[in-house]
Curated annotation (Swiss-Prot), chain B:
Pfam families: EnY2 (PF10163). The gene is ENY2. This is Transcription and mRNA export factor ENY2. It comes from the Eukaryota. InterPro entries: TF_ENY2 (IPR018783), TF_EnY2_sf (IPR038212). There is a cross-link at K74 (Glycyl lysine isopeptide (Lys-Gly) (interchain with G-Cter in SUMO2)). It comes from Homo sapiens (Human). Component of the nuclear pore complex (NPC)-associated TREX-2 complex (transcription and export complex 2), composed of at least ENY2, the isoform GANP of the MCM3AP gene, PCID2, SEM1, and either centrin CETN2 or CETN3. TREX-2 contains 2 ENY2 chains. The TREX-2 complex also associates with ALYREF/ALY and with the nucleoporin NUP153. Component of some SAGA transcription coactivator-HAT complexes, at least composed of ATXN7, ATXN7L3, ENY2, GCN5L2, SUPT3H/SPT3, TAF10, TRRAP and USP22. It is found in: Nucleus, Nucleoplasm. Belongs to the ENY2 family.
Length: 395, 101
């Protein structure tokens, strides 16, 4: 060790330089040797020439450097001008706006989507030439059919919408209620539905059917049919099938438990005293479908006219029978149920209506009033009937 | 006299190499050189040269000795001056540090 120190310190600069060069050459040779081993291994394993390409293909995949083109030579702002056609409303929408539009149009979002759908259907029906009628029908059938096989949400949206008109008459204001029903091009819309008592109700062939009825109690109640008309107003604007399924649900709620199961999403079909569900659950379901004024049926009979009373329900039943007897397939459970009760419904019909006359809470429809004069005729309703004419016609 | 001097030189070299390896400086220098050579394209140049040699000799008949004989002179020549200078500088500093001991 001592000798080593001596030798190192005794070296002059030229010797040190020579040693440095030697070390450097050593290192370079090391690197070269390492590289040679690397290449040799690559050759023997057969991957040395893998990255070789011929000049032709090199030219093919050259990077393009021109204004307006990306490095592959494609025009990169093509998508800006692209437009997609909505499969639902068949409008063309800019590609960047298409996803939000589709969400609204197909009803994936909130309730606003359904409003949008309705608006589209309305505007389509205003100028029918825009889209073919088949399309329209399909859309509207989806909107307005709530058979038992339908999903819950359809029931949820549509039922309260119609029942709004029903419960609205309970309030003693003189408000007029517009219900912009849409189902523009459906052929059943133009049907003239014949009432059991020989009274024909005019349904409109016009596409947007503004339902106008008043909840005033001061209308004359001499006509026994008036009550029927008033309860049936909103339903008569529906097609027979729609009406039936709606009313079937209503009847269901008055005869059976009806609590919606969490697992099956179906309504309980047991009696009102069904032990599996509590009264609270039953009440919740009724409030859900019929609005806050609805209560359990057994309680209802003892309540005053602020509640949803039995006479109303029976009138509804009678309407259902009228409907069920029209042109429905007997295979459906709803219609078969109604036909069972038909005789009873007819019998109680007039008496019930007389009872309710005294309660002075009635609705009347403009279209029906005019329909009284022109019996059994197809007569389109005026799109927005003037308010005073209601009272004139009725009185 | 001459023999003893030669002997002394050899001893000195051995001692320096020992020191280089012990301190790990040799490994560091090697790594630095490799990085620098790849950076400056030395490796790619050599590779191109390798391809020529291999095509000349035939893929199956290439040996490591052939490659070393062909490549090493070229590799030495192709090292850029900047890399050479930097490396020599590092070696000199190392020697200066350990010569003072």
């Amino acid at each position: 060790m001592k000798m080593e120190e001596m030798s190192l310190s005794g070296l002059d600069n030229s010797k040190l330089e020579a040693i440095a060069q030697e070390i450097y050459a050593d290192l370079v040779e090391d690197s070269c040797l390492g590289f040679c081993f690397e290449v040799h291994r690559a050759v023997k394993c057969g991957y040395f020439f893998l990255d070789d390409t011929d000049p032709d293909s090199m030219k093919d995949f050259e990077i393009v450097d021109q204004p307006g083109l990306d490095i592959f030579g494609q025009v990169f702002n093509q998508w800006k001008s692209k437009e997609c056609v909505c499969p639902n409303c068949s409008r063309s929408i800019a590609a960047s706006r298409f996803a939000p539009h589709l969400e609204k149009c197909l009803g994936m979002g909130r309730n606003s989507s359904r409003i949008a759908n309705r608006r589209i259907a309305n505007s389509n029906s205003m100028n029918k030439s825009e889209s073919d009628q088949e399309d329209n029908d399909d859309i509207n059938d989806n909107d307005w059919s709530y058979g038992s096989e339908k999903k819950d949400w359809e029931l949820k949206v549509t039922l309260p919408f119609i029942l709004l008109s029903y419960t609205a008459k309970k309030r003693k204001s003189d408000k007029l209620w517009y219900l912009p029903f849409q189902n523009p091009n459906s052929p059943r819309r133009s049907k003239s539905l014949k009432h059991k008592n020989g009274f024909s109700v005019c349904t409109s062939a016009s596409n947007t059917l503004p339902l106008l009825f008043s909840s005033s109690g001061e209308l004359s109640n001499s006509d026994p049919f008036k009550y029927n008309n008033s309860t049936g107003i909103s339903y008569e604007t529906l097609g027979p099938e729609e009406l039936r399924s709606l009313l079937t649900t209503l009847i269901f709620l008055f005869q059976q438990c009806g609590v919606i199961s969490e697992h099956t999403k179906k309504m309980c079909t047991r009696s009102l005293r069904c032990p599996q569900h509590t009264d609270e659950q039953r009440r919740a379901v009724r409030i859900y479908f019929l609005g806050p004024s609805a209560v359990l049926p057994e309680v209802e009979s003892s309540l005053d006219n602020d509640s949803f009373d039995m006479t109303d329900s029976q009138a509804l039943i009678s309407r259902l029978q009228w409907d069920g007897s029209s042109d429905l397939s007997p295979s459906d459970s709803g219609s078969s149920k109604t036909s069972e009760n038909q005789g009873w419904g007819l019998g109680t019909n007039s008496s019930e209506s007389r009872k309710t006359k005294k309660k002075k809470s009635h609705l009347s429809l403009v279209g029906t009033a005019s329909g009284l004069g022109s019996n059994k005729k197809k007569k389109p309703k005026p799109p927005a009937p003037p308010t005073p004419s209601i009272y004139d016609d009725i009185n | 006299m001459v023999v003893s001097k030669m002997n002394k030189d050899a001893q000195m070299r051995a001692a320096i190499n020992q020191k280089l390896i012990e301190t790990g400086e040799r490994e560091r220098l090697k790594e630095l050189l490799r990085a620098k050579l790849i950076e400056c394209g030395w490796k790619d140049q050599l590779k191109a040269h390798c391809k020529e040699v291999i095509k000349e000799k035939g893929l199956e008949h290439v040996t490591v000795d052939d490659l070393v004989a062909e490549i090493t002179p070229k590799g030495r020549a192709l090292v850029p001056d900047s890399v050479k200078k930097e490396l020599l500088q590092r070696i000199r500093t190392f020697l200066a540090q350990h010569a003072s001991l």
